[in-house]
Every structure is written in C-alpha cells, then in structure tokens.
C-alpha cells in the first residue's frame, strides 16, 4: 500500500510566496510554516511529523526549507525515516528512505552543511548591514513595544508586587521584554 504525498513549505517572511515552493508537485496534503529555519519548534512541522505514517512521502522544495542547521536536518530526517516515511528534496533531487547508502548519508551531510553555511552568511551580511546603517544614522532598531508612560506604569505595578507573568500578558509583551524594561534606566 502506498501512502500519501505530503508537502512541507516554509517561508521566513510574510512577503515570500509559499505556493511557488511546490509548484507543479502533486501532494495530497500540505503543511506550511511562516518561520525561520533556525527554529525547529514550528507548529506545522510538528503537525506534519505527527501526521505522517509508514509509507507516506514527505516532499520538500529544498533541504534549507526543512532546517538550516545540519544537526536539526539530520534529526528531522531520521525521525521521519525511522517511522517508515520517505523524504524527497525536489531542488537537490535527493530521496531518503531510512535504508540509505553511505553515499546518501554523505549527500545529506554535505547539502545540510551548505544550508547551515548559507544561514551563517545571511546573519553576517545582516550584521554588516545594520552596522553600516547605524553609522549613517539610518538604523534605529525596533520600535519600543510600550510608551514611556506604560513602562512607568509597569514598573510601579511590579514594585507593588504584581506577578510579572500576568503583567507581561496584560501588556502584550514577552516576559523577556518585561525584564528588559525593568533593567534599563528610563
């Protein structure tokens, strides 16, 4: 019995077109995430892993869409193939079944290392671009989530003993952001 063909799509930004990744590829069902490849805790990836069954084939445009880190890529591929799920990477023309040859494992490692290297280059270019923009005065960073008045209110309520987790939720910020506001001088 042959299983389903399941597509996985990941885009990093909301302005990227997810449909083009598996254009012309027939799938029975598709899972799509809008998240960075560095994070493996992606809701639709986790749903796909739970959904896939023995005999199914997961189809992904390219390895870097599944993971940008070699260890994460290997782990995801191994998790799926150990359950009898096949994986196809369209761009690289590679398939993995769990009964792979040493050559197939080498290709996974090499191509995964390229994806990881590409991520490092992207981060480096981003840092350089931000540094240049700061020198020109064009980069100001992200806009603060709270106004000065709201930060003052937040501090007063923390000093009054209110729970920080509850306040973070009420103010619509993460706990880490709350702690950053408490650490910085106004």
Curated annotation (Swiss-Prot):
Record GO biological process: DNA integration
Keywords: DNA integration, DNA recombination, DNA-binding, Transposable element
Entry protein name: Transposon Tn21 resolvase
CDD domains (alphabetical): HTH_Hin_like (cd00569), SR_ResInv (cd03768)
Pfam families from the UniProt entry: HTH_7, Resolvase
Domain named Resolvase/invertase-type recombinase catalytic: residues: 4-137
Family: Belongs to the site-specific recombinase resolvase family.
Species this protein is from: Escherichia coli
Function: Resolvase catalyzes the resolution (a site-specific recombination) of the cointegrated replicon to yield the final transposition products.
DNA-binding found in the keyword field: yes
Further remarks about this protein from its record: Tn21 is a transposon encoding resistance to sulfonamide, streptomycin, and mercuric ion.
Catalytic center residues: 12
GO molecular function: DNA binding; DNA strand exchange activity
DNA-binding region: 164-183
């Amino acid at each position: 019995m042959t299983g389903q063909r399941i597509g996985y799509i990941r885009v990093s930004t909301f302005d990227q077109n997810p449909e083009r990744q598996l254009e012309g590829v027939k799938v029975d069902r598709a899972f799509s995430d809008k998240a960075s490849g560095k994070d493996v805790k992606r809701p639709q990836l986790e749903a796909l892993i739970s959904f896939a069954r023995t005999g199914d084939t997961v189809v992904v445009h390219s390895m870097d869409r599944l993971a940008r880190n070699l260890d994460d890529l290997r782990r995801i591929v191994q998790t799926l193939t150990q359950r009898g799920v096949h994986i196809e990477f369209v761009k690289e023309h590679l398939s993995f079944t769990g009964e792979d040859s040493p050559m197939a494992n080498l290709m996974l490692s090499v191509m995964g290392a390229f994806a990881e290297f590409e991520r490092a280059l992207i981060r480096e270019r981003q840092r350089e671009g931000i540094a240049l923009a700061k020198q020109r005065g064009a980069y100001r960073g992200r806009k603060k989530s709270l106004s000065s008045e709201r930060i003052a209110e937040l501090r007063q309520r923390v000093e009054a003993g209110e729970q920080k987790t509850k306040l973070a939720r009420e103010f619509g910020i993460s706990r880490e952001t709350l702690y950053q506001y408490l650490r910085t001088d106004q």
